[in-house]
Amino acid sequence: MKNTINSLIVATALSALSVCADAQSFQRILERPVNIVRSEWEYDNDGNQELNYYNEDYCNYYLYRVNDDSYNLRPGKNTVFKRMKDAQYNNLFNRATTYMFFRGSFPKDFNINTPYAFPVKNGMQTAWKTDRRESVRTLQFRMLPGDTVYATRSGIVCRTMLPRQLLICHADYTFAAYLAMNENFVSPGEEVRTGQPVGIAGPTGVSISFFFLDKNKFSGLEAAGYVYSHFTPVFRTAEGDVKPVERKMYNALVDDELIMLDMSKREQKKYLKSKK
């Protein structure tokens, strides 16, 4: 009887871990919260008819329309079509079409050599290995359960389905999805800084997938299946900026130059002044 009870406890624990892991999988973090993007036909103050899309997220979405114009939807109101009052032309949005929403926008000024920080405390050692639980390129970093997870790059926190999920959009429209954390310190809409504590590592440390919406996946008449591309960034270490080799240990370095990488000149000046 005792063995049966112990087996049930173990099975329940494993089931809970499985559900937790699934909830923090990369595919789950890409899911769009209900009604996060909605459309409305409305009239402006001059009586012109508008088709407006409202993006209630803090990050961009891409409205893809098959065989037709597509649009970037920034946070807030986006007018994608306007018919002037008493105009005689046809409304192109009245005809049937297939459309889809995707997180993000095509990257601007993307540079594969842009340096990132390791998700560990400045000066600590870490390594990465491929997270085999994910079907896309995901880096599982060597950390102890309960260790603090630090932001690898500055950006804005996007809305997700669950509070422990963390998705950050960077200035060039690349993303970092932080997976398998036990706790998330930051909230949607919050601007995080490189090296800022963002959460607590789970039983397997933390896994991060770096990715972007790939324009090349839309080169045909329709989106070619999976529309994101994943990459391994260059990381800043005590030995310099390196493309890290899997399972090799590195000394993490977070310096002022890295922290200020995506800041405007005004923000840089304010940051340096705050350190005096």
How would you name each of these model-derived features?
Residues 151-185, 205-209:
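Zn2+-dependent peptidoglycan hydrolase active-site motif and core
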Residues 125-150:
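Short glycine/threonine/proline-enriched tight-turn/helix- or strand-capping micro-motif at secondary-structure
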Residues 23-76:
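Cationic-aromatic interfacial patches
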Residues 1-27:
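Bacterial Sec-dependent N-terminal signal peptides
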Residues 66-96:
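Intrinsically disordered, low-complexity Pro/Gly/Ser/Thr-rich segments with frequent PxxP/GP/PP motifs
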Residues 149, 155-157, 189-201:
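A structural signal for short beta-strand/turn segments enriched in small hydrophobics and glycine
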Residues 112-116, 187, 209-276:
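Acidic, glycine-rich catalytic/binding loops that coordinate metals and/or anionic ligands
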Residues 87-121:
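Terminal connector regions
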